[in-house]
Amino acid sequence: MKELDLTQGSVPKVLLQFAVPFLIANVLQALYGGADLFVVGQYDDSASVAAVAIGSQVMQTITGIILGITTGTTVLIAIATGAKDDRQVASTIGSSIWLFSIIGIVLTLVMVLFHDRISSLMHTPTEAMEDTKSYILVCSVGILFIVGYNVVCGILRGLGDSKTPLYFVGLACIINIVLDFILVGAFHLGPTGAAIATVTAQGVSFTIALWFLYRRGFHFEFTRRDIRLNRVLSKRVLTLGAPIALQDALINVSFLIITCLLYTSPSPRDKRQSR
């Protein structure tokens, strides 16, 4: 992997070299739901479009929270890397694997168990309710892929490599769009097909990212003994990542509220008919 040494060279230049790929990757990751929405809109009715719009916004909120928390891992690894403390880097990586495995399992269980309740809380239109539940349920099964991908990318960014994660998410977007057209356009699976496409793309992206990390390895010793939960490091990861996760969550929740208001407010036609 090509690691960028952020402690040397011109600060503005190095910062741009690192930040631009990171920003583009985040934008592409947010476009999963947009791709689903576009393709479903080409082949299905308005109820299906509403289901994907609601479901993708819910999943985007979850993704934002995960991305925010993994930033804590990136920051700790970057600090240890700058200090040339390879043991601290290895311990942070190992502890993060445990921490985010737990977070991923908990989020998956919560979303799978309460996907129907979440759909109801979103004031989903009756005609779109079943498709919304299906979309959220299928996407929830893939939460571990979202967590795993963001952890791997967080590790790479902490080591100074922000370009490789961009390639991973770019590939995932292409796979998602292709599968959307196949499952929604050719097989007419509607929102469920779009959700399957998204989860498959995320799974492929995570698998390739994990394979890349394994094949390329680290410039320091990292063994199975390093993969253990360190409470101090885990607390620091959460302390650093929680404010960013909260910020992303609040932004996405505001969009969720707007979505709810759109589906609870009477349309102009309904207002005219009530007069």
Locate each region found by the language model.
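Single conserved hydrophobic/aromatic residue that forms the stacking wall/gate
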Residues: 263-275
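Residue-level signal for short hydrophobic patches within transmembrane helices
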Residues: 12-31, 58, 62, 141, ...
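Hydrophobic transmembrane alpha-helices of multi-pass small-molecule transporters
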Residues: 61, 176-177, 206-210
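Small-residue-rich hydrophobic transmembrane alpha-helices
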Residues: 49-109, 146-165, 265
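Helix-terminus/linker motif at the lipid-water interface of multi-pass membrane proteins
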Residues: 31-50, 119-126, 182-189, 249-266
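Residue-level signature of transmembrane alpha-helical cores of multipass secondary-active transporters
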Residues: 22, 139, 165, 236, ...
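Short alpha-helical transmembrane segments in multi-pass integral membrane proteins
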Residues: 1-19, 77-144, 186-241
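Alpha-helical transmembrane segments of multi-pass membrane transporters/permeases
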Residues: 100, 155-178, 192, 196-199
